[in-house]
């Protein structure tokens, strides 16, 4: 008779300041539907830090019967690749499988925003669809035409201009936190000239870096992100999704807020480094007189984990320098690496959800993650006996060729555990670390004259240590007390040590990979 393993209980829905904000909006019926998004740039593989964002955004959508779009913020063709698009899609689908599948928002393949009239004004919107063979993730690059038209509108309103400063001069003119910036000498160009130059930028008339489009805000603003930030730059580089159609590309801050709007996002949730970007997010949306409800940005503290890097840029360096064997190296904190290592998606979800959501950066001990994995696997994983560094043990009172039947429990945490047959034979292997010829005090494993129990079998006593001419141990000769097996008269006899073993004749070879922490310092990203 078999028994199903008992899965860990589902934890109650979490509570935090972001969810409190959303709950307030739901109560006042501010939006017809809660729509969040997970918008990675496809320039690397996802890691544990992304898992926190994925679970927060999909979790909020799940708790409110809403939707969470998977969107690629692919506005920098130099660093992005379809390999990353594929890996990110795989990782997200794996992480939410059986948990938030119903909340995943895709779009019809090849679909672009549809023109519509909202409150009497022209508008654009890209409606989601359920994942299928005919759908795909959202891409910011699918909005390039609309983003370009929005930029023309900003120019026409006198809120954007074409600037000829080099990247170095632009940075120099920006100033510092305690010193105002200087206005670009090209800031006063006429609307007509700016429109002409921007259209020619799009047509490919100028080389990389020759010109850029900047917002016209305030070069003396205390917030440096409001000092006439770049909106577009020239890059004659093919795009992984858009091909060769464009040679001007929008900057992240410009594309991100408008992509949120085009998708009908209600809550744009990101990490704390974007707090200073929020005024620009709001300025861009407010400057365009958009007719539909605007998204709002909310920030939370990202995951910092001890002995772990959670930075795509630094993880890429490990891959490029061949310190690890690729993005899915089992020592990597990438979702693909963790999956290859055998860590269940549910363990990752429970870990990041259990950390909570705050506005304060902190360092989480890696042991917390390891405990989350252990708690998830303990009720589910079948146990097996294994010996990695064997030493031969001969049970002298068992005849050669004799096999004594024993039973091992598959999972002792099952309420009705199943068992498997084991064979106790004359020769077995034990772990070399489970024997000490000269034992330290309070050593309870095998030692000269000592007794231990072979797990699921019987108690044995060490009688003789056999060595070769060089003085190296070749085998341990023991006596097995077969009356201490399960169901036998002395099965309740107690000894202080129980050790693993495998039959020398019936064991199978296995390749075992033991992975430890990749870094030896608690905060590898700090150096």
Label each PLM-derived region with a short phrase:
Residues 2-183, 273-297, 302-311, 316-319:
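N-terminal Rossmann-like or analogous alpha/beta NTP/dinucleotide-binding catalytic cores
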Residues 9, 138, 268-272, 302-306, ...:
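Generic amphipathic alpha-helical segments used as scaffolds and interaction surfaces in large
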Residues 31, 101, 160, 207, ...:
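Intrinsically disordered or highly flexible coil/loop and linker segments, enriched in small
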Residues 52-62, 85, 89-92, 244-256, ...:
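Structured alpha-helical segments in the cores of large, soluble enzyme domains
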Residues 66-68, 256-266, 293-296, 314-318, ...:
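Short acidic (Asp/Glu) and glycine-rich catalytic loops that position anionic groups and cofactors
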Residues 76, 82, 89, 112-114, ...:
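Active-site cores that bind ATP or allylic diphosphates and position pyrophosphate for catalysis
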Residues 326-425:
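Extended, domain-scale alpha-helical bundle/helix-rich regions
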Residues 458-527:
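C-terminal, non-catalytic macromolecule-binding modules
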């Amino acid at each position: 008779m078999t028994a199903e393993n008992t899965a860990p209980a589902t934890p109650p829905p979490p509570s935090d300041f972001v969810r409190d904000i959303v709950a307030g909006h739901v109560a006042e019926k501010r939006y017809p539907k809660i729509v969040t998004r997970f918008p990675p740039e496809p320039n690397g593989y996802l890691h544990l830090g992304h898992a926190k964002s994925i679970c927060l955004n999909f979790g909020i959508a799940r708790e409110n019967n809403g939707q969470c779009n998977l969107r690629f913020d692919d506005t920098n063709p130099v660093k992005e690749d379809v390999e990353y698009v594929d890996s990110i899609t795989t990782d997200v689908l794996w992480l939410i499988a059986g948990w938030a599948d119903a909340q995943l928002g895709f779009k019809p393949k090849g679909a672009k925003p549809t023109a519509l009239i909202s409150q009497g004004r022209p508008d654009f919107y890209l409606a989601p669809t359920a994942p299928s063979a005919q759908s795909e993730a959202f891409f910011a690059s699918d909005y390039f035409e609309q983003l370009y038209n929005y930029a023309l509108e900003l120019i026409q309103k006198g809120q954007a201009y074409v600037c000829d400063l080099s990247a170095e001069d632009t940075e120099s003119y920006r100033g510092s936190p305690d010193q105002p910036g200087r206005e670009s000498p090209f800031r006063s160009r006429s609307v007509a000239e700016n429109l002409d130059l921007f259209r020619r930028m799009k047509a490919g008339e100028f080389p990389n870096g020759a010109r850029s489009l900047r917002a016209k805000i305030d070069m003396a603003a205390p917030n440096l992100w409001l000092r006439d930030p770049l909106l577009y730059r020239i890059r004659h580089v093919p795009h992984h999704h858009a091909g060769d159609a464009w040679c001007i590309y929008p900057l992240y801050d410009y594309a991100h807020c408008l992509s949120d709007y085009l998708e009908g996002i209600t809550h744009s949730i990101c990490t704390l480094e974007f707090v200073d970007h929020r005024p620009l997010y709001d300025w861009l949306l407010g400057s365009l007189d958009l007719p539909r409800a605007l998204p709002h940005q909310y920030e939370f503290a990202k995951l910092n984990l001890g002995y772990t890097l959670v930075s795509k840029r630094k993880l890429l360096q490990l891959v490029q320098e061949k310190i690890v064997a690729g993005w899915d190296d089992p020592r990597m904190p990438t979702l693909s690496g963790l999956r290859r290592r055998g860590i269940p998606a549910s363990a990752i979800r429970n870990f990041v959800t259990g950390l909570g959501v705050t506005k304060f950066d902190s360092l989480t001990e890696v042991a917390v993650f390891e405990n989350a994995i252990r708690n998830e696997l303990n009720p589910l994983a079948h146990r097996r006996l294994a010996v990695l560094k064997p030493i031969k043990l001969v049970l002298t009172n068992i005849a050669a060729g004799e096999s004594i039947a024993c039973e091992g429990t598959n999972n002792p945490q099952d309420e009705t555990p199943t068992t498997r047959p084991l064979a106790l034979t004359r020769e077995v292997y034990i772990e070399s670390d489970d024997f000490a010829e000269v034992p330290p005090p309070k050593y309870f494993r095998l030692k000269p004259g000592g007794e231990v129990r072979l797990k699921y079998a019987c108690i044995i006593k060490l009688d003789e240590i056999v060595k070769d001419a060089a003085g190296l141990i070749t085998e341990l000769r023991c006596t097995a007390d077969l009356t201490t097996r399960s169901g036998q008269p002395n099965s309740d006899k107690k000894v202080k040590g129980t050790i693993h073993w495998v039959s020398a004749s019936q064991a199978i070879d296995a390749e075992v990979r033991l992975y430890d922490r990749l870094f030896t310092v608690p905060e590898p990203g700090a150096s």
